[in-house]
């Protein structure tokens, strides 16, 4: 696999997990700051735990990728 392809795959993975992190944060923000959103779920604690786990998993994946593979040259923006 070429260096360019490797960089693109790395960038795609980071972007994927950042999107998952953003989604989880957005959902948790709604639950924490909007009582209307909370009223729709009878089991709010399980929902909060589910989204907290998704947030933690995404952050862990990003950290793991950066720790193990960030020594690659920076990916050009564009």
Predicted stretch roles:
Residues 2-78:
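Extended, charge-rich alpha-helical interface modules
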């Amino acid at each position: 696999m070429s260096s360019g392809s490797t960089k693109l795959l790395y960038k795609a993975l980071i972007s994927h997990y950042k999107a998952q992190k953003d989604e989880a944060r957005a959902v948790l923000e709604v639950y924490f700051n909007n009582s209307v959103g909370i009223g729709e779920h009878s089991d709010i604690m399980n929902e909060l735990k589910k989204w907290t786990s998704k947030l933690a998993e995404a952050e862990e994946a990003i950290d793991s990728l950066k720790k193990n593979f960030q020594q690659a040259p920076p990916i050009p923006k564009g």
